[in-house]
């Protein structure tokens, strides 16, 4: 790990709100299902506004983009703020499409799959809309776009790169790779998923919400890369908080018994370091 990466990871994982200070641009992106989406965009401070640069399209999980309580309510939550800081510090622009607010939701986590009005199909439409929007942006390097998704957003990334879907295979602007943190892989496994582009998965050994087993099998089936982080639960890369039991989540390995979520202060920074290394290797 380089000295610069160490500095930024310490900053992000211990004092993310003090470190975070970039200007956030607000945009409207049209999903391919015609929904107008809010989107937040951050650029590296060190680059000219018109200078082409790599872009990360960051896909939030079932809890949405924002903090829901405290003084930072309505702002990027710590995980997204920390990732924005990490990416922009290393020369990447990062785009956060908000799939929930204009559809009247703030979170899906406590909803059963069968009752959710926002489906993975809506969210993959949002990815397609974001890619179409990026095609029109002169600062976006079309050859260096990566999808990054957590949990529900990770599953969205899987659907968004599945070569079995015609819209994926025929895109004009094709992402370079997809990187996912603890996605749900069971549906992709059943649907004979075929990645159009390279796929890397960051998985939590003890995850009882979206268990690593199906993702490991999926990776072996399709030749994807994966990393399993020991002694880690869902949301282990969150830069704040501690492991807790969420009894309000009905979907998990043990329905009705809740799921464990929360930060691992050792493996979380390791995974974000691996993310940076993966991005660099992608474009060597």
Question: How does the language model describe each region?
Answer:
Residues 22-51:
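N-terminal cap/lid segment of alpha/beta-hydrolase-fold proteins
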Residues 37-38, 52-136, 240-241, 246-261:
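Serine-hydrolase catalytic machinery in alpha/beta-hydrolase-like enzymes
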Residues 65, 72, 118-195:
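Primarily recognizes the serine-hydrolase "nucleophile elbow" in alpha/beta-hydrolase
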Residues 195, 201-203:
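Short beta-strand/loop motif that positions the catalytic acidic residue
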Residues 206-210, 234-235:
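Acidic catalytic loop of the alpha/beta-hydrolase fold
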Residues 210-220, 241:
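Short alpha-helix in the alpha/beta-hydrolase fold that links the catalytic acid
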Residues 224-284:
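C-terminal catalytic histidine-bearing segment of alpha/beta-hydrolase fold enzymes
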């Amino acid at each position: 790990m380089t000295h610069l990466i160490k500095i930024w990871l310490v900053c992000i994982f211990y004092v993310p709100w003090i470190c975070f200070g970039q200007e956030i641009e607000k945009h409207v992106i049209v999903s391919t299902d015609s929904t107008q989406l809010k989107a937040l965009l951050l650029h590296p401070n060190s680059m000219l506004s018109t200078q082409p640069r790599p872009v990360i399209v960051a896909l939030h999980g079932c809890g949405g983009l924002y903090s829901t309580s405290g003084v930072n309510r309505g702002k990027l939550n710590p995980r997204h703020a920390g990732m924005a800081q990490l990416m922009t510090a290393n020369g990447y622009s990062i785009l956060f499409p908000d799939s929930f607010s204009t559809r009247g939701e703030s979170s899906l986590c406590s909803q059963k799959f069968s009752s959710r009005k926002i489906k993975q199909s809506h969210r993959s439409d949002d990815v397609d809309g974001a890619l179409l929007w990026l095609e029109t942006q002169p600062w976006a390097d079309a050859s260096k776009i990566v999808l990054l998704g957590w949990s529900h957003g990770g599953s969205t990334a899987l659907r968004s790169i599945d070569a079995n879907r015609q819209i994926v295979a025929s895109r004009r602007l094709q992402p370079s790779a997809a990187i996912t943190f603890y996605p749900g892989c069971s549906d992709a496994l059943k649907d004979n998923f075929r990645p159009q582009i390279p796929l890397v998965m960051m998985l939590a050994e003890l995850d009882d919400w979206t268990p690593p087993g199906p993702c490991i099998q999926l990776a072996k089936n399709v030749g994807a890369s994966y990393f399993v982080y020991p002694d880690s639960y869902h949301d282990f890369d969150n830069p704040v908080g501690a492991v807790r039991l969420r009894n309000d989540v009905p979907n998990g390995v043990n329905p009705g018994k809740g799921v464990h979520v929360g930060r691992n202060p050792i493996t979380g920074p390791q995974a974000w370091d691996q993310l940076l290394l993966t991005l660099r290797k992608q474009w060597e």
